[in-house]
Amino acid sequence: MVQDNGGAIAQKGFNYQNHVISLTAIRNYTKNNFEIFVESDDDFEVLYDDNYHAYIQVKGKKRIGLKSLLQKHEGKCSILEKHLTPGDGHSKYKIVVFHFTESELSKMQENTSEELFEHSLKLSTEQTDYILEQLDESFSTKLTNFSLVKTSFKNDYLEARTYLKGELINQGISVDGRDDLILDELDRLIKQKSEYIIENKDDKKLKRI
């Protein structure tokens, strides 16, 4: 009998997403007016200062590439089109992965002004033109604000936890043997905020970390 592993696979995806949100919080919590909103207009959003707003999509599975990001199913928007829909020309857009098509990665360029993560990649001119052939030209400005983030950890719970513990130390956060407790509490908070259902625009504040 073939086992249905859909639930387990979905849970791994959520674990990876939560680890990415945790990493973002650990690396950036000292920024002025720093806020994270989970499961709102995207997998999560980051705001800081008075004008920074990033929409972040997390893909915790293999075989991710430009083709899959642009693929439409049953007439619905593609992943990339949906990702670029909220916000405006000043917003930042990031898709976070642990695996991406190598031939496409090699064409991308290092983003020298990455704000949230250790590093990220910008699309090449060729890749940008390819995407705009399949998206409305109105997405052109937003696409210039898009970057791809490839994490140093895979979609593996223990590997991600080990990496996050190292990041706590790198950011000068005193753990005193409480690193597991800190990460557990952060994970609990992310899950709690993710479960709130938005019924009107005022409910978005319930998603804030």
Task: Locate predicted features.
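Acidic metal-coordinating catalytic centers involved in nucleic-acid phosphodiester chemistry
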Residues: 1-8, 61-209
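Basic, amphipathic N-terminal segments that precede the first structured/catalytic domain
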Residues: 1-3, 11, 15, 26
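A sequence-composition feature that detects small, non-aromatic residues
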Residues: 8-10, 25, 54, 160
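Catalytic centers of nucleases
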Residues: 17-81
